[in-house]
A protein has these predicted regions:
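Macromolecular interaction modules
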Residues: 2-258
């Protein structure tokens, strides 16, 4: 039986422009902490975050081209979820494991976005995501037309694209977690994403997108990442709200022994 994405906007790619919120977090991780970081992110952090009301899914990617080395993201029911009391409670009460892990983040960039456009049917399990963080002289409607044009050229039905714009107000909120990793939002106003089942397909779409956006673009930060993990709220047995996230203190695991 063909599996379906439990959230209609992700399944069909036809979400209204403002229907989804998106958090993007780019960071390098200390080399001697990477395994520990992946364990934390898989086993505690993503399940905790995706259990917060309004969160749809979380993902983590590793860089193939560009930097930083890791890209973490969350999709929410709307941008307002990223400034909700439940989410802010989690950000201001990190677990011991989170507090430890965040000290190993380097070159962190965390931006909160509102969605202008999401088209195509590749879905969140597509193994490759190509990104362009950038500024542009054109307005959001014109930029959305560019990503729609690139996806429309694909005849395989296995390509998705999105345009996101930074929400400066909620991106700038200071929290306990942010004080630990000492980072903030990126400089660029916009984010293009192309999700694909094939690396060559993603890179070809990126070249078409680059040609369309070339005139008027500045501060371009490119990247190509492959998917390491994805968790959806529908997959959690007992999702928890942020106010009880501190219960993770009692299950703080021992360190891994290589």
């Amino acid at each position: 039986m063909k599996s379906e994405d439990p959230h209609p906007a992700l399944a069909t790619g036809q979400a209204p422009a403002e229907a989804l919120g998106f958090m993007g977090f780019w960071a390098d991780i200390d080399a001697d902490y990477e395994l520990r970081y992946q364990e934390w992110h898989n086993c505690e952090h993503m399940p905790e975050r995706v259990g917060i009301p309004g969160f749809i899914e979380g993902r983590r990617y590793r860089a193939l081209l560009g930097s930083p080395r890791f890209f973490m993201c969350y999709v929410t029911d709307g941008p307002e979820v990223l400034g909700s009391p439940a989410y802010l409670a989690a950000l201001n009460r990190p677990t011991p494991w989170t507090s430890e892990s965040l000290t190993h983040f380097r070159n962190p960039v965390r931006s909160l976005y509102r969605n202008h456009c999401r088209v195509g049917r590749a879905g969140g399990y597509a193994p490759y995501i190509l990104q362009r963080r950038f500024d542009h002289k054109a307005d959001a409607a014109t930029l959305a037309g560019m990503v729609r044009a690139v996806v429309a050229e694909d005849t395989s039905g296995t390509l998705s694209g999105g345009l996101y714009e930074v929400d400066e107000a909620i991106s700038g909120i200071m929290t306990a977690e942010r004080r630990i990793y000492s980072g903030g939002p990126g400089r660029q106003q916009y984010l293009f994403t192309i999700e694909a089942l094939d690396r060559d397909q993603a890179e070809a779409a990126g070249r078409r997108l680059d040609a369309l956006m070339a005139e008027g673009a500045s501060e371009i930060n490119p990247g190509l990442y492959w998917l390491e993990n994805r968790i959806q709220s529908a997959e959690l047995r007992r999702p928890v709200a942020a106010p009880v996230a501190a219960a993770a203190d009692t299950r703080f695991p021992e360190r891994l022994t290589p």
